[in-house]
Amino acid sequence: MTARIFAIFWLTLALVLMLVLMLPKLDSRQMTELLESEQRQGIMIEQHVEAELANDPPNDLMWWRRLFRAIDKWAPPGQRLLLVTSEGRVIGAERNEMQIIRNFIGQADNADHPQKKRYGRLEMVGPFSVRDGEDNYQLYLIRPASTSQSDFINLLFDRPLLLLIVTMLVSAPLLLWLAWSLAKPARKLKNAADEVAQGNLRQHPELEAGPQEFLAAGASFNQMVTALERMMTSQQRLLSDISHELRTPLTRLQLGTALLRRRSGESKELERIETEAHRLDSMINDLLVMSRNQAKNALVSETVKANQLWNEVLDNAAFEAEQMGKSFTVEYPPGPWPLYGNPNALESALENIVRNALRYSHTKISVSFSVDKDGITVNVDDDGPGVSPEDREQIFRPFYRTDEARDRESGGTGLGLAIVETAIQQHRGWVKADDSPLGGLRLTIWLPLYKRT
């Protein structure tokens, strides 16, 4: 690819330079040298005219008539001869030709190097030197141009800017092909990178075809994806294995606590042990949920309507809020908007952020839904302590806790929002945290609408 770019660049540059340098020389309206045949013809005419004048004695009263007779006699068919005296008088010219004749005489006045030049449909040739005793005349030939140069070509030569534009248009296909050959594999690489950024770790064999440099980059990209996929799989397996292994000692701990209560009765120590065991059990459950969600293949997707998916979650949250003495309002309920995904994962995502609001709010929780042509937006607001701007991106990390008002007594396992982010990203959506109009935290979920293709 590097060699191709280099070659195309220099080829284009060479073509442009060649056009700029050579085109003016191809203008038939420029002074050009005579062909050998034209040179011989001119010398022959010159000799015939000299001989004719030598055979025709001069007449002082009508000296020009003998000049007319000579040039009329020896003019080639369809052409005319002109004689220019040493005083600059032109013999044999028509009035409407005087301007071009004077222009040509001003440029071609050396009989040792006769030239030719086009003027529209006419062409002038000369000069050739004719001796008439002590007088010397310049002999010129005026004839029809063999092929008239088109007005468009004349316009090109007369307008350098237009010539530059035409040159650019001529070179444009080559440059467009070069740009396309570079942009196509680069676009494929970008699309593949976007898929990886969205969590879709799959191989892209099409990246390993094309120019050598992009082929190598595509192979490296696929190797990176393979390594990431292997690492993610190992991490998920480790997380799942640890969670399952913790189940056995946790079950034994809960069983031992129950036996100890039977023997010794209730105590603060036993109550604390049961509380921590229950929290550990919840944490293990959350770890297993997150591990399953991160394994994309485990998510069985289907088409579901938003109101059918989330109405039960909202009803349960309203009931729990009433029991807690808090206000729970749904300002704009969900409609029958189509979503495509795993119902359990999507239901769990909304449930987690609603429970988060119930846990940290003082008295108010508000939920609103909106839809546009692209997707569904869900806002969950509370009037709790909120989260500082520097912590808003971090709260979606597993086990991350803010310093203020987020201790273990009120903060759950620290995995709820991580589960939310994983589930939403699995469905090509996003979740973010912001300030709430109620004074606390606003959690926003966006999910794309399902569109049949």
Swiss-Prot record:
Coiled coil: none annotated. Signal peptide: none annotated. One of its GO terms (cellular component) is plasma membrane. Residues 180-233 form the HAMP domain. The active site is at H244 (nucleophile). Keywords: ATP-binding, Cell adhesion, Cell inner membrane, Cell membrane, Kinase, Membrane, Nucleotide-binding, Phosphoprotein, Transferase, Transmembrane, Transmembrane helix, Two-component regulatory system. Residues 1-4, 181-453 are cytoplasmic. The two-component system is activated by envelope stress such as overexpression of some (misfolded) periplasmic proteins. The chain crosses the membrane at residues 5-25, 160-180. It comes from Klebsiella pneumoniae subsp. pneumoniae (strain HS11286). One of its GO terms (biological process) is cell adhesion. Interacts with cognate response regulator CpxR. It catalyses: ATP + protein L-histidine = ADP + protein N-phospho-L-histidine. This is Sensor histidine kinase CpxA. Induction: Part of the putative cpxR-cpxA operon. The gene is cpxA. ATP binds at residues 244-247, 355-360, 382, 401-402, 412-417. It holds the Pfam family HisKA.
